[in-house]
Amino acid sequence: MSRRCELTGKGVQVGNNVSHANNKTKRRFLPNLNDVTLMSETLGRGFKLRISAAALRTVDHRGGLDSFLAKAKDAELSEKALKIKKDIAKAQAAA
């Protein structure tokens, strides 16, 4: 399972621990990923996604999964999220 947010593309970053004596050792900064189920109002069902806590706040701020995906760039989304975005667009066009 990859350590990458399915909605924002946020992943692992690399940096240094720096001691008081200024010794540097490599370390990894891991994203705060959570397994959540987000509801789509258009499709009327939930989708299980692995997203960062920041992405969860952003989805809530933008008014839900449907509106978040409508504004999201395709390059940042995972294959699963892209499929959901296309299904939502198709359902909205049919309605």
Swiss-Prot record:
GO terms for biological process: translation. This is Large ribosomal subunit protein bL28. One of its GO terms (cellular component) is cytosolic large ribosomal subunit. The keyword Ribonucleoprotein applies. GO terms for molecular function: structural constituent of ribosome. The gene is rpmB. Coiled coil: none annotated. The keyword Ribonucleoprotein applies. Keywords: Ribonucleoprotein, Ribosomal protein. Gene3D superfamilies: Ribosomal protein L28/L24. Belongs to the bacterial ribosomal protein bL28 family. The lineage of its organism: Bacteria, Pseudomonadati, Pseudomonadota, Alphaproteobacteria, Rhodobacterales. Pfam families: Ribosomal_L28.
